[in-house]
Amino acid sequence: MFIGEYNHGVDSKNRIIIPSKFREELGESFILTKGLDNCLYIYPMEEWRILEEKLKKLPLTNKDARAFVRFFFSGANEISIDKQGRALIPQNLMKYANINKDIVSIGVATRIEIWSREKWEEYNDANIDYEQIAEKMSELGI
């Protein structure tokens, strides 16, 4: 399970450090793709296969389903971690997530989210009513 928040930079070759606690669970390679809220999602291969199967079952006749599947698969890249614990972020994903210099990696149970530091701070500064969200989650059995 991925938990925690880590701050680090991006080098001149668009490489980021994958925190050691995350590397242990990711293995040698993983899938990096566009995420919601203009962040990037990292999935271990096993979790990606589970998501992939669910996405492939969505009806091709549904316009929203097609758009959602395109969104995830068009941005997906298989990424390897080098010996220094770094991973290369493709330029199109850097642009999508507005990543320039500093990033925040957060563990979100089965995936990792990569945020530009600015976007993460904006997200955290937004007036999110977590009590209201908690009520909605309780309706879903959480």
UniProtKB/Swiss-Prot annotation:
Cytoplasm among keywords: yes
Main subcellular localisation: cytoplasm
CDD domains documented for this protein: MraZ_C, MraZ_N
GO cellular component: cytoplasm; nucleoid
Disulfides per UniProt: none
Gene Ontology terms, MF aspect: DNA-binding transcription factor activity; transcription cis-regulatory region binding
Compartments, record wording: Cytoplasm, Nucleoid
One of the Pfam families matching this protein, by short name: MraZ
A GO biological process held by the record: negative regulation of DNA-templated transcription initiation
Keywords: Cytoplasm, DNA-binding, Repeat, Transcription, Transcription regulation
Keyword Nuclease found: no
Domain SpoVT-AbrB as annotated: residue spans: 5-47, 76-119
Matching NCBIfam families: division/cell wall cluster transcriptional repressor MraZ (TIGR00242)
Summary of subunit composition and partner proteins: Forms oligomers.
PANTHER family with a match to the protein in the record: TRANSCRIPTIONAL REGULATOR MRAZ
Family, similarity comment: Belongs to the MraZ family.
Full protein name: Transcriptional regulator MraZ
Organism taxonomic ancestry: Bacteria, Bacillati, Bacillota, Clostridia, Eubacteriales
